[in-house]
Amino acid sequence: MALPAHLQETFSPEEVQFLVEEETVKIFPRITTRQKRRDKNRGAYGDVDTKWSMLTTENDNLNNMVAMRSTEVKLWIALLLKQQNKCSIVAPSWLTLRELNRKIQQETNNSDRFCDLPWNWLVIANVLFAKAADDFHDPVHELRSKVQDLREIRQTKVLKGLKQLNASHLQLDNLSLLEINELRPFIVRTMDKLREIHDSANTDGGVVDGDEEEI
């Protein structure tokens, strides 16, 4: 079955989030999944190899967690544990008021390039705001505002960059997946039209040259 035209050119929001949820994040688990057994000779408990899995997964960290000891798991697992109140999610280092203000300043001071941000920064921010708002040290409403400011500044720079668009390429380094996904349909159609104009101009030029030679 053929996909709708708009899904042939871009990822759907669900597809974008699915890709991003495969990224690793740090958590503080509130449960212990590491198993122990009693040493009959010494009367003590020792760590042993896991005989079962919390989930059907190869994620060793997931099956070796100790309560309140930080570990790293896939984002989708962290969200599942968070939903069950079994962990706290540690916000990325760039997702603080201090760092966002610094990124905004960099974007403002450099009109010809974008500051370095993770490829998934917008999706990560929105997911954590929605699912783990209580895990942030900074007020979430202020973080949302800064993320929106940063996004709008970058969108303005993108529009300025489109003035440099030609039939061969457009260089927009450091854009995130979501930003590129939003721009792609417009850019693809515009570049296709520019190629048509370019090819048409070359063809017309060739015909004119031929007529001049015959004359």
From Swiss-Prot:
<comment type="function">
    <text>The GINS complex plays an essential role in the initiation of DNA replication. Has a role in chromosome segregation.</text>
</comment>
<dbReference type="Pfam" id="PF05916">
    <property type="entry name" value="Sld5"/>
</dbReference>
<dbReference type="InterPro" id="IPR021151">
    <property type="entry name" value="GINS_A"/>
</dbReference>
<keyword id="KW-0235">DNA replication</keyword>
<dbReference type="GO" id="GO:0033260">
    <property type="term" value="P:nuclear DNA replication"/>
</dbReference>
<dbReference type="GO" id="GO:0043596">
    <property type="term" value="C:nuclear replication fork"/>
</dbReference>
<dbReference type="Pfam" id="PF25005">
    <property type="entry name" value="PSF2_N"/>
</dbReference>
<keyword id="KW-0539">Nucleus</keyword>
<comment type="subunit">
    <text>Component of the GINS complex which is a heterotetramer of SLD5, PSF1, PSF2 and PSF3.</text>
</comment>
<comment type="similarity">
    <text>Belongs to the GINS2/PSF2 family.</text>
</comment>
<dbReference type="GO" id="GO:0007059">
    <property type="term" value="P:chromosome segregation"/>
</dbReference>
<dbReference type="InterPro" id="IPR007257">
    <property type="entry name" value="GINS_Psf2"/>
</dbReference>
<protein>
    <recommendedName>
        <fullName>DNA replication complex GINS protein PSF2</fullName>
    </recommendedName>
</protein>
<dbReference type="GO" id="GO:0071162">
    <property type="term" value="C:CMG complex"/>
</dbReference>
<dbReference type="InterPro" id="IPR056784">
    <property type="entry name" value="PSF2_N"/>
</dbReference>
<dbReference type="GO" id="GO:0000811">
    <property type="term" value="C:GINS complex"/>
</dbReference>
<dbReference type="GO" id="GO:0000727">
    <property type="term" value="P:double-strand break repair via break-induced replication"/>
</dbReference>
<keyword id="KW-0159">Chromosome partition</keyword>
<dbReference type="InterPro" id="IPR036224">
    <property type="entry name" value="GINS_bundle-like_dom_sf"/>
</dbReference>
<dbReference type="GO" id="GO:0000785">
    <property type="term" value="C:chromatin"/>
</dbReference>
